[in-house]
Amino acid sequence: CLYEAYRTYVLHDKANQLQNVYSILGGSTHDVLEGITNGEATEEDLLPTIQKDLDELQMLDINFPSDSIRDGWVADMTHFCKTYKAPKGKFTTEEFFLYKSPNGNYLQGYIDLIKHNADGTVSIYDYKTSSMYKGEDIKKHGRQLIVYALGLEQKGYKEILCI
């Protein structure tokens, strides 16, 4: 529905979106990472944010599919939070893209992070916090970066590196 798309993509109405353990944790992690890149947060904000969200999820009885998945996710994200270093350079966060396919259909969304490289190219980054993104599946999900690149090309970007 057009109104739901408007609420999601223009108003950023999170109440309009299905809430599950991955959307909640991923959303807050993305927010802190964006804040770090924009100078509004620090690396030290990551782990407390995740711990607070895990406590709230437990209180609300919103659970991971299994305890072993939860334990693995917590271990992986704790390691990430303790080792993450803010990127250096010129960046754009949450860049809107609109891609018109050859058959006339449109895809739209927001790119988590674009790095503007010294040589005039850009690199596209997309944060993934779900345990779904591993092994061979990561290649399939990496196609998302190709769609982002196509959208940026249509927007006028000339040299794009997908990462």
Please provide the spans of the model-predicted regions.
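Conserved aromatic-histidine-acidic binding/catalytic patches
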Residues: 17-21, 65, 136-140
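Mg2+/Mn2+-dependent nuclease catalytic core
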Residues: 91-163
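Hydrophobic (often cysteine-bearing) scaffold residues that line and stabilize catalytic clefts
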Residues: 21, 25, 69, 73, ...
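A residue-level signal for conserved active-site and pocket-lining positions in enzyme catalytic cores
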Residues: 1, 29-30, 113, 148
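Short coil/turn segments at secondary-structure junctions
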Residues: 13-16, 61-64, 132
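A non-catalytic, helix-rich entry segment at domain boundaries
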Residues: 28-95, 100
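Residue-level signal for well-ordered alpha-helical scaffold segments within enzymatic catalytic domains
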Residues: 8, 31, 35, 79, ...
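Nuclease catalytic cores
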Residues: 2-41, 94-95
